[in-house]
Amino acid sequence: YIGSQYEKRRSAGWSDSRGGFGSSHSDYEGAVIAGNTFDFPAVHGESLMAAGYSFVSTSVKAVEQGVAKLEGYKVLDIIAGKQKETKVGYGAYPSKYKLLSSALIQAVENATKTGANVLLTGAYVASDVFDHQSPNAEEVAFAKNVMGYAWGGSQASCTGEVYTIPTAVKQIPGYTDIKYNNELNSKVYCVESPNSIFASDKLGMPFMRYTENNRNAGIVSRREGYRTAVLGFPFETIVSREVRDLLMKQILDFFASEK
């Protein structure tokens, strides 16, 4: 990637002095652009440890195959990043990278029945479930009934700025300004299209909004026997380490409280 495409007319011819169809800007030529560095459990783990918690990590595949058991843990931190269902070629092969598989849904739901609280963060946590011509009923039921969230729209922000708001959840007092990365750079991947989400029932409430338009960026929910928190952008893209630590501690304090 060297820059955004500016010539989209197929009829535009190419010459040495004039770029034709497919020509793009060169403002990123030679620049190092961060992608998936596969070390985000460590980024989340830093904030978990700063809040006084220990942690272990596992792959989704290990959970789906039953190798890693989720029962017995107090908190599940699901790192969704920018994962979403992606078509392969012209559709001759099955799509890949869907966020929620049936096996993962069952594993997380079983864990919540033993009291596990769940934190889910990612740019497509809602749109990958709801934004389909025929949404999968199992996925929708999991999002709404187990996690307590629903889709409020895509392309929720272009500034990368959110803020927490005062709610009935005393552990998250509000008035914290948060910046997540929305620009290509060499340190952490760019979030171009975060989700807006809202609580699916009266057990939950929004606690975070996108600064530019006040759309919901995150919800918390008191479920039956456990609690959840969902963000419409990836936690690991929050620019400030101090803010990541603060937000993680507030969410964990909410999980641990009885009110």
Question: What is the meaning of each model-derived region?
Answer:
Residues 61-67, 102-106, 213-218:
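Alpha-helical scaffolding within the catalytic cores
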Residues 1-3, 56-57, 74-80, 84, ...:
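Structural recognition of the beta-strand scaffold that forms the well-ordered cores
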Residues 235-247:
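A short acidic/glycine-rich loop-to-helix N-cap element
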Residues 194-197, 207-227:
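Short, surface-exposed beta-strand/loop micro-motifs that present aromatic residues
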Residues 49, 68-72, 110-114, 198-200, ...:
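Extracellular/periplasmic catalytic domains that process cell-envelope and extracellular macromolecules
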Residues 5-8, 62-64, 81-86, 118, ...:
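Solvent-exposed loop/turn segments at secondary-structure junctions
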Residues 1-75, 79, 235, 249-259:
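Aromatic-Pro/Gly-enriched surface loop or interdomain linker
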Residues 84-187, 204, 211:
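A glycine-rich, often tryptophan-bearing local segment used as a flexible ligand/cofactor-contacting loop or short
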